[in-house]
């Protein structure tokens, strides 16, 4: 799931701002989400009544543009948001008062470096152009892939484009490769325009996706957030037990068929209670945010997005997950 900077920003901001105001009128907490499979899963929680069952007074607020949701949380226009770790660290370094309270998933194949059908190795990628949104998760994955194959950024030519435009550039042959996430991976494959050379399945723990909330709201509505976590754990159990039924609930929200959307789910490792405790607490697992924060911040410092490494203890609130998992 890469950063979608300002796709439909003006329209998306106005629409989502209006939805946010309506949500605040009828719920204690507004939770922003966008089209990543691990976040569309919240509609399963809503559909199945888990939010109500576990006492989470939460209204889901849909954002057509992912980065608009990140900006809305930082500005305090929503109470909580579904966003990636890589897009959470910079606001934390800027002292935005937010806390990570839940891990929804890790990308496990839903982010990929896609290449045209003439390229079958990293050696074949040398000297070629890669369309990718710079300073995003997709660039992070691409740079990681290059390094793992003994190549560097100087061995390729990065072309800065939004993720949708990156996919279009590969499909039309304007570039040899593109850093994208689903559903763009599926759209490239459906047009037989390319295949994955490297995916997030080959980099466990590299791309954690989170629920991040305003610190003051967490303090004021802890019971609601505990209920939210319980609802999430129930959602994960349901999706794992009934993937086809879950896909039927989720697919209409992203304008895909259930069959196609089921493939997206397979590339997302949803985190239930056990994996949340692993991720939200210190430990040796690649899934621990204490480890991925260091790795992710190293990349962000290299591209000059941040100038400091935040302490995970300062922004990870494991109390919500630990209480919900009892």
Regions found by a protein language model. Name each.
Residues 294-326:
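Conserved C-terminal helix/tail region of periplasmic/extracytoplasmic solute-binding proteins
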Residues 9-18:
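Bacterial N-terminal signal peptides
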Residues 1-9:
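Bacterial N-terminal signal peptides that target proteins for export
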Residues 24-166, 172, 176-182, 197-199, ...:
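Short, glycine-/small- and polar/acidic-enriched structural segments
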Residues 86-87, 158-159, 165-259:
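Pocket-lining segment of extracytoplasmic ligand-binding domains
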Residues 127, 190, 317:
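Phosphate-coordinating loops and pocket residues in cytosolic domains that bind phosphorylated ligands
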